[in-house]
Amino acid sequence: MKEKFDLVKLLNILKKNIKLLLILPAICLVVSAALTFFVMPDKYTASTQILVNMKKSSSDLAFQNVQSSLQSVNTYTEIIKSPRILDKVSREFDGQYSTAELNSFLKVTNQTNSQIITVSVTTGNKSESDKIVNKISKVFAHDMPKIMSVDNVTILSSAHDNAVKVSPIVSVNLVISIIVGIVLAILIIFLKELLDKRIKTEEDVESQLGLPILGSIQKF
């Protein structure tokens, strides 16, 4: 019974502060929308896929060759991000992007037990993301045989106007802002209730003052 009473009291507190519960999430929503559409820069990611094959010797078995290639994938990902590759890419762009900038744009990943490397570049310009990731892949494919003993480097897929917008994600930002607004409103409401020591009901007299109720005056 007490739990039911507490729930009713809780709902009454929220109902009494319904304006704050509606206004604060609305304010957060408007602020988030303004930041998302007018402040936060757009980011576009373009990707290519690369396959690196080790050189085969007459004594190598196909399985051993694949295993060797798999074990070397981590090395290849580090080489792609190395100054040896990115310095050359920077020169190809006539210094428009420094090596450090290119490295900040770049992300190199691969799936477990796969020889395929995914090279991704994220910038604020859709076409530039395409150009940079394609250039990095081409420079790597050209220079890799000179760096390590590999048979060939194949660019499986290039970026051709396929960069996708990765941020800001409007729907996610707006939903998060509403949730944050509701949480803040609830916190403010209950904090206000906790700090409010005024006696408003007969129950408050008993709980806060420890005095019995002798009678009450009705409102007319």
Curated annotation (Swiss-Prot):
Biological process (GO) annotations? Answer: capsule polysaccharide biosynthetic process
Q: Which family does it belong to?
A: Belongs to the CpsC/CapA family.
What InterPro entries has UniProt attached to this entry? Bact_polysacc_biosynth/exp, LPS_length_determ_N_term
Q: Name one Pfam family in it.
A: Wzz
Name-wise, this protein is: Capsular polysaccharide biosynthesis protein CapA
Q: What does this protein do?
A: Required for the biosynthesis of type 1 capsular polysaccharide.
For this record, an example GO cellular component is: plasma membrane
- Tell me, what is one Gene Ontology molecular-function annotation carried by this entry? protein tyrosine kinase activity
The subcellular localization recorded is: Cell membrane
Q: Which organism is it from?
A: Staphylococcus aureus (strain COL)
Pathway given in the UniProt record: Capsule biogenesis; capsule polysaccharide biosynthesis
Membrane topology summary: Multi-pass membrane protein
Give UniProt keywords alphabetically: Capsule biogenesis/degradation, Cell membrane, Exopolysaccharide synthesis, Membrane, Transmembrane, Transmembrane helix
